[in-house]
UniProtKB/Swiss-Prot annotation:
Sorted UniProt keywords: Cell membrane, Cytoplasm, Disulfide bond, Glycoprotein, Ion channel, Ion transport, Membrane, Phosphoprotein, Sodium, Sodium channel, Sodium transport, Transmembrane, Transmembrane helix, Transport
Lineage: Eukaryota, Metazoa, Chordata, Craniata, Vertebrata
The protein's name in its UniProt record: Acid-sensing ion channel 3
Chain span(s) of sequence motif PDZ-binding: 530-533
Ranges in the topological domain labelled Extracellular: 41-435
Parts of the chain on the Cytoplasmic side: 1-19, 457-533
Protein's gene: Asic3
Topology relative to the membrane: Multi-pass membrane protein
């Protein structure tokens, strides 16, 4: 640090003077407190007002910061129009899981107890109720049994159920559906987007601009109710779920029913939901591992099918969680569950998998946050009876069935968008950083009449004080030490001069070499001067 002159020192002292700073600071009130003169009542009142305003300002700032730290959010609802909408996936399941005509004695041997609650002694009577002969003498069951193969073979076939199919007036068929296993058995999904298939869209709303299908529920194939079990179906019809292609169906929990003898109109409205991630919300955007989750375990043999990681969904997360839990407890998975574990045998279904899954659902141990973006479909249902008296005979001739069969087995399902718009439900942060800064600035201007530049002025003044009072202290101390050292040196030199004897300019005896006269001084320079003299 260079030495400072007296003028620089005075300017530095003036810059760090609180009175000089208060007279030029833009913060209101400081000039009235630190002005020239002594303590007066007016100055005390100004000091009190400034302190109270400063306390109120700090309280408001702390309150705003606390509110911001709670990370509140708000939900907005907006109705938006679109030129076209992607048609949803539609999953259909017959309420009856297995056809009576396809069950064999081998099926009853392996799965009769687990699925139907039959004792081995009741197999013959049940086969007679199915209209089939009992097992022949010497019947030997197969060494192994696969539940997925049972449902693929004995479940209702879409080729037999689907009487008519049209999408936006154009014909469609079983090839437009994808087989998928759910807890209700073998089901079928329209417009699933599986295997890279292009998703269908619609440019118009209203009936006739969606999916219209006519189905035969095949009541003659329904299994006879032998015992009242927990999952025994007493109804007849089709279970339907309308969902996004990004999530697997949970039709046993979220599906609605369509009854035979009725045409069911389903008016849909698309809802696009957006949730916030932490700390404002708890949504998740991570993709699910295909080893833990495959939303299409539709291979009857249960062989794993490699595919890209599916997007995160709430239903997919729960299925993956349930699959891992059952696999850990039982060493297998239920046929509708994702994963690479082997499909449980009927005995494992009865003894382990079903009880474990029910216990898990009661405890609700799966913690699955909402996805950050998802699509749902609001529905409005209405029904009319079919067939009319005028159409009953025509339909009976067309499908080679009786009029009573048409009334008891045939249904029509019409799914369409209500209008070509959708609802955008979005979570947003209720209090942003910009709002926090705006509130702090407003409180600062209201209570103490300051701004961001005022804070810079205060920081600049504190730097001046630090440089003058702290660094200046060490500089002055160092300068004092230097001055003290110079004084001691000067005194030592002066002391040496006082010990040198008075030299006369008159005649004197011959001088001796410097080695002799060196005793007059310890300095070589002094020795030289004395010798010259």
């Amino acid at each position: 640090m260079k030495p400072r002159s007296g003028l620089e020192e005075a300017q530095r002292r003036q810059a760090s003077d609180i009175r000089v700073f208060a007279s030029s600071c833009t913060m209101h009130g400081l000039g009235h407190i630190f002005g020239p003169g002594g303590l007066t009542l007016r100055r005390g009142l100004w000091a009190t007002a400034v302190l109270l305003s400063l306390a109120a300002f700090l309280y408001q700032v702390a309150e705003r910061v606390r509110y911001y730290g709670e990370f509140h959010h708000k939900t907005t609802l907006d109705e938006r129009e679109s030129h076209q909408l992607t048609f949803p996936a539609v999953t259909l399941c017959n309420i009856n899981p297995l056809r009576r005509s396809r069950l064999t004695p081998n099926d009853l041997h392996w799965a009769g107890t687990a699925l139907l609650g039959l004792d081995p002694a009741e197999h013959a009577a049940y086969l007679r109720a199915l209209g089939q002969p009992p097992a022949p003498p010497g019947f030997m069951p197969s060494p192994t049994f696969d539940m997925a193969q049972l449902y693929a073979r004995a479940g209702h076939s879409l080729e037999d159920m689907l009487l008519d199919c049209r999408y936006r007036g154009q014909p469609c068929g079983p090839e437009n559906f994808t087989v998928i296993f759910t807890r209700m058995g073998q089901c079928y999904t329209f417009n699933s987007g599986a295997h890279g298939a292009e998703l269908l869209t619609t440019p118009k709303g209203g009936a006739g601009n969606g999916l219209e299908i006519m189905l035969d529920v095949q009541q003659e194939e329904y299994l006879p109710i032998w015992k009242d079990m927990e999952e025994t179906p007493f109804e007849v019809g089709i279970r339907v779920q309308i969902h996004s292609q990004d999530e697997p169906p949970a039709i046993d929990q979220l599906g609605f029913g369509a009854a035979p003898g009725h045409q069911t109109f389903v008016s849909c409205q698309q809802q696009q939901l957006s949730f916030l991630p932490p700390p404002w919300g708890d949504c998740n955007t991570a993709s699910l591992d295909p080893d833990d989750f495959d939303p299409e375990p539709s291979d009857p043999l249960g062989s794993p099918r490699p595919r890209p990681s599916p997007p995160y969904s709430l239903i997919g997360c729960r299925l993956a969680c349930e699959s891992r839990y059952v696999a850990r407890k039982c060493g297998c998975r239920m046929m509708h569950m994702p994963g690479n574990s082997p499909v449980c045998s009927p005995q494992q279904y009865k003894d382990c998998a079903s009880p474990a899954l029910d216990a898990m659902l009661r405890k609700d141990t799966c913690v699955c946050p909402n996805p950050c973006a998802t699509t749902r479909y609001a529905k409005e249902l209405s029904m009319v009876r079919i067939p009319s008296r005028a159409s009953a005979r025509y339909l009976a001739r067309k499908y080679n069935r009786s009029e009573s069969y048409i009334t008891e087995n045939v249904l029509v399902l019409d799914i369409f968008f209500e209008a070509l718009n959708y609802e955008a439900v979005e979570q947003k942060a209720a209090y942003e950083v910009s709002e926090l800064l705006g509130d702090i600035g407003g409180q600062m201007g209201l209570f103490i009449g300051a701004s961001l530049l005022t804070i810079l002025e205060i920081l600049d003044y504190l730097c001046e004080v630090f440089q003058d009072r702290v660094l200046g202290y060490f500089w002055n101390r160092r300068s004092a030490q230097k001055r003290s050292g110079n004084t001691l040196l000067q005194e030592e030199l002066n002391g040496h001069r006082t010990h040198v004897p008075h030299l006369s300019l008159g005649p004197r005896p011959p001088t001796t070499p410097c080695a002799v006269t060196k005793t007059l001084s310890a300095s070589h320079r002094t020795c030289y001067l004395v010798t010259r003299l």
